[in-house]
A protein has these predicted regions:
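Single, function-defining residue in the core of a domain
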Residues: 1-4, 12, 21, 25-33, ...
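Short alpha-helical "recognition helix" segments of helix-turn-helix
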Residues: 9-16
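Solvent-exposed, charged/polar functional surfaces in cytosolic regulatory/catalytic domains
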Residues: 44
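Glycine/small-residue-rich loop that forms an oxyanion/phosphate-binding "nest" at active or ligand-binding sites
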Residues: 47
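Conserved beta-strand elements of the Class I
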Residues: 59-61
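Conserved mixed alpha/beta core segments that line enzyme active sites in large multi-domain catalysts
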Residues: 81-85
Length: 389
């Protein structure tokens, strides 16, 4: 669907006839969908697609979240935010946590939470534990500073996978036990023993006092319990200069014989592709123009847009762009590719076919690498149901 009202969307697909389904019939069909049905469809679709691997070995999965403004409902306390200077009437939000395959340009899983109940830590652990990956597959989970926690590290390690997560100076200093003041480059392996007890007498390895880190009872750590009072974890702490005078801390468990500083810089920049994917599902795929008020239906729309995104991305990636002597390298215009793929999916009955790849290849745009822009934080109210054709 696009940004029109439901009735117009139905006319667009079925034709402007008296036989077109009604709005009530459409919503009755939505009610028949079982919880988890669209997730199963996403996973089944992804299994049929080939994977692009980093260094021919690792699948790169970026994990991040994005807020989505939904229909205003002050009675839903789990999604409603009180009025403020930017929103005098208040607003409601859902929160989309997603795993995104960077090299394949497709979403692999979602955890959708109500705005006020959002918890990126638990969502990350859930996606890692339920990841639909092959038995011998190797995955690198990449995430921003908000995901740096011992519990997240442990979940990836216990699932036999790898992670590369940005971290603040304060958190890294807590792990290392020393200041980063004046440190411009760092690549250090550390062993840490996590425990909820602050008593030195209860330690199983008192001779390794500098290895111990206390985990508060208020902080989730799923691998500590009354039976298992200590958890040992091995980390690699890296500090790289991304641009002149700009340093980033990365915490990982990647082997040093395969990944050096240049590899980490490359991976760091690749992670931002997920931000583009969130933009694509909100604007070219019209997720900002929701068609539902009920939260359950909003979730269905999110899953549906993500499945459509993966379908469009797979076709766009495999469309060859003619090579010419130009100032810039060119790539497929994804916004146009979405419109073309959507028109293709509407073909049914006796309608003629269309040259999807040819149309996509004729709509291209220049690739301008290295450009950066400051993020503009501004509130945008969701598109009202009253202002659609």
């Amino acid at each position: 669907m696009e940004g029109e009202c439901i009735k117009e969307e139905l006319y667009t697909f079925f034709g402007r006839t008296t036989d077109a389904p009604s709005k009530s019939a459409f919503y009755k069909q939505l009610q028949k969908l079982k919880d988890g049905a669209l997730r199963c469809l996403l996973l089944a679709f992804n299994r049929r697609l080939s994977k692009n691997l980093f260094n021919g070995k690792y699948q790169l999965l970026a994990c991040d979240g994005s807020a989505l403004d939904i229909f205003r409902n002050p009675d839903d306390k789990d999604t409603f935010y009180e009025p403020n200077a930017k929103s005098p009437k208040g607003y409601n939000q859902a929160y989309i946590n997603a795993c995104y395959s960077i090299l394949d340009r497709r979403f692999t899983d979602l955890v959708i939470q109500k705005g006020r109940k959002r918890n990126e830590y638990s969502a990350f652990c859930q996606m890692v534990d339920t990841a639909d990956i092959g038995h011998l597959a190797m995955v690198i989970y990449m995430a921003d500073r908000g995901f740096a926690s011992y519990n997240n590290f442990a979940h990836v390690i216990e699932n036999g996978q790898y992670f590369l997560i940005r971290s603040s100076d304060k958190r890294v200093e807590g792990i290392l036990g020393r200041s980063l003041q004046g440190v411009k480059s760092l690549d250090l392996h550390v062993e840490r023993i996590l425990t909820r007890s602050q008593s030195k007498k209860k330690r199983e390895h008192p001779e390794l006092a500098e290895y111990y880190r206390h985990i508060s009872s208020r902080v989730p750590m799923d691998y500590l319990s009354d039976e298992k009072r200590e958890y040992r974890i091995s980390l690699r702490v890296v500090r790289v200069e991304i641009s002149p005078g700009c340093f980033e801390n990365l915490i990982t468990n990647l082997p040093d014989h395969e990944f050096d500083m240049d590899d980490f810089k490359e991976l760091y920049h690749l992670r931002w592709n997920e931000e583009n994917a969130f933009r694509d599902i909100k604007y070219p795929l019209c997720l900002k123009a929701l068609h539902s008020k009920k939260y359950e239906y909003v979730e269905q729309e999110i899953w549906a847009r993500v499945i459509l995104h993966n379908f469009c991305a797979e076709i766009a990636i495999n469309t060859e762009v003619e090579k010419r002597q130009r100032k810039y390298e060119y790539q497929v215009n994804y916004s146009q590719a979405v419109k073309i793929c959507r028109d293709f999916l509407r073909i049914h009955g006796q309608k003629s076919t269309m040259d999807v790849e040819g149309l996509i290849a004729s709509n291209i745009e220049a690739v301008r690498p290295g450009r950066t822009f400051q993020r503009q934080k501004r509130f945008k109210i969701p598109m009202s149901f009253c202002y659609r054709n």
